[in-house]
Design a protein with these regions (language model features):
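Membrane-embedded alpha-helical segments of multi-pass membrane proteins
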Residues: 4-11, 38-43, 79-87, 178-190, ...
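Alpha-helical transmembrane segments of multipass membrane proteins
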Residues: 46, 128, 189-196, 215-216, ...
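Membrane-interface helix-loop-helix regions
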Residues: 65-79, 107, 117-185, 189, ...
């Protein structure tokens, strides 16, 4: 129970870290159609960070990397990913629903690649380097195994987060966060097939290429239906918003309180955010957020939206910060002697470099590519406003 009190300094330092970082490393906030979604994203990524901090807290003592025994900390990971998947499905299905012209599928898939790849490849190569460093830069596997694991890490771990150069549990270096990316790609590649049911045309060439890539990912990565339910709920929300664009009742403070109550029930009674009832609760909460419920103006605030911009980098980078600190700066053996209070105070301190590095990554890796892609080609549809995705 005391562990929940340790979160207080974590969130206090987060607040000041985001404020100060945005004063020093300035990034403008774009006009978007759903600012509440942008505001939500940053918190989701930070909850994933806390999820992995709890896992590390157990791992340092037991050497077992396993889901948190705490309902809250398990929801920090699982429910946050559920929301990420719903956001992806909602935004892209909404774009299809708002399409009045032909959809440029070639640009769509290229833009997705260049949106995800730059920040990812930097972190993936960092994982590879750390694994190589921890094996004393000696090649411990044959060339074919080395290339196989390297290729898997480069291409979003579609063949799994393979151990690199015989470094056991290589995935722990980045806290295993890459597993969600193949599922993102599965949805991206399913989109033209979904579009057919919405009378959005796609050529046979597009369907063949997308179908081939989809088959390759599913063949190597596999697919768990339980992870696809979140995308389905995101699709349903998109159709509902398209048919009923506004709902003042769902954006009220009373509904905000009701939404928080659902979250509390979900966390208290369920250990997993992937079970049907927690999924249903999450879908309802996401629905009211899309209906401009900002939860007492928190999600639509400039603070939340600035924090939300670094979501992807924060998601990818936090595991590296934890691993480098715990393994190479402090040392796992010394970390074992930390009391729980000492450990969570250390986590509080690590919030600062995590936010700063994520801000730098967004500004100098993600944002230039986002702007470059936008300048080169214009989407084959005219969205009502630009939603950065």
């Amino acid at each position: 129970m005391y562990i929940y009190f340790y979160l207080i300094p974590v969130f206090i330092i987060l607040f000041f870290s985001v404020l100060v970082t945005n004063k020093i490393i300035k990034i403008s906030i774009p006009n978007v159609q759903y600012p509440e979604i942008d505001g939500l994203r940053g918190y989701l990524a930070f909850f994933v960070f806390l999820h992995h901090c709890f896992i590390w807290e157990v791992y340092r003592k037991t050497n077992e990397w396993k889901p948190p025994s705490s309902n809250l900390f398990n929801h920090f990971g699982e429910t946050s990913v559920v929301f990420f998947f719903m956001i992806t499905a909602f935004l892209f299905i909404s774009k299809l629903l708002n399409t009045k012209q032909s959809f440029d599928w070639a640009y769509y898939i290229k833009s997705r690649f260049f949106r995800l790849f730059p920040a990812y490849i930097v972190t993936a190569l960092t994982v590879v380097f750390i694994a190589f460093y921890n094996t004393n830069f000696n090649l411990n596997t044959n060339y074919s195994e080395t290339i196989k694991s390297l290729v898997s890490w480069i291409f979003f771990t579609i063949n799994g987060p393979l151990n690199f150069n015989s470094f056991q549990n290589t995935y722990i270096i980045n806290a295993g966060v890459a597993w969600t990316l193949p599922y993102e790609w599965i949805f991206y590649l399913l989109l033209p097939f979904i579009g057919l049911f919405m009378r959005i045309k796609a050529s046979l060439k597009v369907l063949a290429v997308f179908g081939l890539l989809l088959s390759i990912i599913i063949y190597f990565n596999g697919i768990s239906i339980k992870h696809m339910y979140a995308f389905l709920f995101g699709i349903l929300v998109a159709f509902m918003i398209h048919k009923y664009p506004s709902n003042s009742i769902l954006s009220s403070n009373k509904i905000s309180i009701f939404g928080l109550l659902l979250l509390i029930i979900s966390v208290y009674y369920f250990n997993s955010g992937r079970k049907f009832i927690p999924l249903l609760f999450s879908a309802f909460i996401f629905l009211i957020i899309v209906y401009r419920n900002s939860f007492f103006n928190i999600l639509s605030s400039n603070f939340s939206r600035k924090f939300g911009q670094i979501t992807y980098s924060l998601y990818l980078i936090h595991g590296l910060v934890l691993f480098i600190t715990f393994n190479h700066i402090i040392g796992v053996e010394k970390l074992k002697d930390y009391s729980m209070l000492h450990y969570w105070l250390l986590v509080s301190v690590l919030v600062v470099p995590t936010v700063v590095i994520s801000q730098l990554s967004f500004k100098y890796i993600e944002l230039p590519m986002i702007n470059k892609v936008k300048k080169k080609i214009i989407y084959g549809y005219q969205p009502r406003s630009s939603q950065r995705i």
